[in-house]
């Protein structure tokens, strides 16, 4: 039983510099966590006080990490081994608190191990640069060198519900790799995976002062997390509105904001329709459609639209969903019943405005069926705004110019997918789509845990995540020069 596992592992307590804080508080000072499918409470976490949040920052700020590259790599490699050994436990916890099906939860648990391994490998690389100074007529016989150092203060990390473990990994691992200190606040809807993640790192040998996990009500502690004097950088993944609030509140400190997306898959007239429809369906429904890089708009050339729609409908009907603990199913629930109700209302609104519902839009609690809606117009809210669930809205276009115009016609700019074999089309999409990533004949969300990832416009400020890029964001660069004969 997952409830007993949570108690046995003491996941009902925060981790402030490794210490278990806050278990057993009164109901008024705890947050209940529910299984989205059953609706039953599986545990609770404490509501941190402002004093506890400040203590976490003070401990981090006072501690000066001295881990060598070898020691950091060893810790991350041991953490990878532990997380791999405990993969079934990690996956079961993800599924229980987020409602993700076991297929998706197991995949995410494997990704966490990958992040640990990539982080360990990156630690061993020295990315310093060397500049010879005799490059101009007034140059000198000197060389300028660069080196990266940890931030002077503490990193604040705030993570969302949709990837309870992997989002945490992408914040914490680069922090460990760069000898930084971090205070992590996971989503109050899915806190247990983050606490278990911290325990894995402590077991692997991480000095506990380098990582604290605080849980609580954002209305009480969010401003302190953003504005604490010891916070040198705020890294946040989540919705646009909250990201912009952080940007306005944080003041003179660094920010890495990975926000929402409204990612298209664009299917041209020369595309392999079987391949394109398979990618479209997987991109729309994996992780219950709750990914910033999920397919949220299907843009299809009118010449192949009917064939594409037929295949998408057939593959959607075959996409099994239900109890997330059933390892045979392709999809579990969305995060909670209000989210499912929101998706249902968005689809109903589009249908009332002339779109055609082909399959789905069935809701039971937090369970929401894979849904296909055809003849959607770009101005409908279903596709104008981000619909963060398993909905496949189909928009038909006449040529590449219109496809690019529609794709760029929202406030978002995260990722995209294009299905074509024509190089002239590919080069135009790469050049003209206002997004952070363009994947050819692949889903918008495809990436390695190592590669740069992030968006522009309302999807982010252009800073990238991914282990390599986060390491750069989490460090200060210093130059020094020496005489060189």
Label for each model-derived stretch:
Residues 1-141:
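N-terminal Rossmann-like NAD(P)+-binding subdomain of aldehyde/semialdehyde dehydrogenases
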Residues 36, 50-53, 69, 87, ...:
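Residues at or immediately preceding the N-termini of alpha-helices
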Residues 38-44, 74, 231, 266, ...:
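Conserved C-terminal structural/oligomerization subdomain of aldehyde/semialdehyde dehydrogenase
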Residues 39, 72, 94, 116, ...:
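Residue-level signal for inorganic ion chemistry
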Residues 41-48, 61-66, 156-157, 265-267, ...:
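Short, well-ordered beta-strand elements within core beta-sheets of diverse protein domains
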Residues 61-64, 80-87, 91, 98, ...:
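Structural signal for hydrophobic packing residues in well-ordered secondary-structure cores
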Residues 128-275, 397:
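Rossmann-like NAD(P) dinucleotide-binding subdomain of oxidoreductase/dehydrogenase enzymes
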Residues 241-377, 400, 440:
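ALDH superfamily catalytic-core signature
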């Amino acid at each position: 039983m997952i409830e007993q596992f949570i108690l046995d592992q003491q996941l009902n307590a925060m981790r402030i510099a490794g210490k278990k804080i806050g278990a057993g508080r009164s109901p008024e000072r705890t947050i209940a966590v529910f299984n989205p499918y059953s609706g039953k409470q599986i545990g609770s976490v404490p509501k941190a006080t402002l004093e506890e949040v400040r203590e976490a920052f003070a401990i981090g700020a006072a501690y000066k990490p001295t881990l060598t590259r070898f020691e950091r790599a060893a810790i991350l490699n041991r953490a990878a081994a532990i997380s791999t050994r405990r993969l079934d436990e990690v996956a079961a916890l993800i599924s229980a608190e987020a409602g993700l099906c076991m297929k998706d939860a197991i995949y995410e648990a494997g990704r966490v191990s990958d992040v640990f391994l990539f982080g360990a490998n990156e630690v061993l690389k020295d990315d310093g640069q060397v500049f010879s100074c005799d490059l101009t007529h007034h140059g000198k016989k000197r060389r300028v060198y660069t080196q990266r150092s940890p931030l002077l203060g503490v990193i604040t990390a705030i993570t969302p519900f949709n990837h309870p473990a992997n989002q945490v990994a992408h914040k914490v691992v680069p922090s460990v790799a760069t000898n930084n200190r971090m205070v992590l606040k996971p989503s109050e809807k899915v806190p247990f995976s983050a606490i278990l993640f911290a325990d894995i790192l402590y077991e692997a040998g991480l000095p506990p002062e380098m990582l604290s996990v605080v849980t609580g009500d954002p209305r009480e502690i969010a401003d302190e997390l953003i504005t604490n004097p010891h916070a040198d950088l705020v890294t946040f993944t989540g919705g646009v509105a909250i990201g912009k609030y952080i940007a306005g509140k944080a003041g003179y400190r660094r920010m890495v904001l990975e926000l929402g997306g409204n990612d298209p898959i664009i299917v041209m007239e020369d595309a392999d329709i079987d391949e394109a429809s398979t990618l479209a369906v997987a991109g729309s429904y994996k992780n219950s459609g709750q990914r910033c890089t999920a397919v949220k708009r299907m843009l299809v050339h009118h010449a192949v639209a009917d064939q594409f729609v037929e295949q998408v409908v057939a593959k959607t009907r075959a996409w099994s969903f239900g109890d997330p603990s059933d390892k045979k199913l392709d999809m579990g629930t969305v995060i909670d019943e209000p989210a499912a109700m929101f998706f249902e209302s968005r689809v109903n609104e589009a249908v009332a405005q002339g779109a055609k519902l082909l399959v789905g839009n069935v809701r039971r609690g937090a369970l929401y069926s894979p849904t296909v809606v055809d003849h959607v117009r770009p101005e409908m809210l279903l596709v104008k705004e981000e619909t963060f669930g398993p909905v496949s809205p189909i928009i038909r276009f006449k040529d590449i110019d219109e496809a690019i115009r529609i794709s760029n016609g929202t406030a978002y700019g995260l990722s995209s997918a294009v299905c074509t074999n024509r190089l002239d089309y590919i080069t135009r999409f790469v050049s003209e789509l206002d997004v952070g990533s363009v994947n050819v004949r692949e889903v918008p969300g495809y990436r390695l845990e190592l590669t740069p990832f992030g968006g522009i416009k309302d999807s982010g400020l252009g800073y990238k995540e991914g282990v390599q890029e986060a390491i750069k964001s989490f460090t200060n660069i210093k130059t020094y020069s020496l005489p060189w004969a």
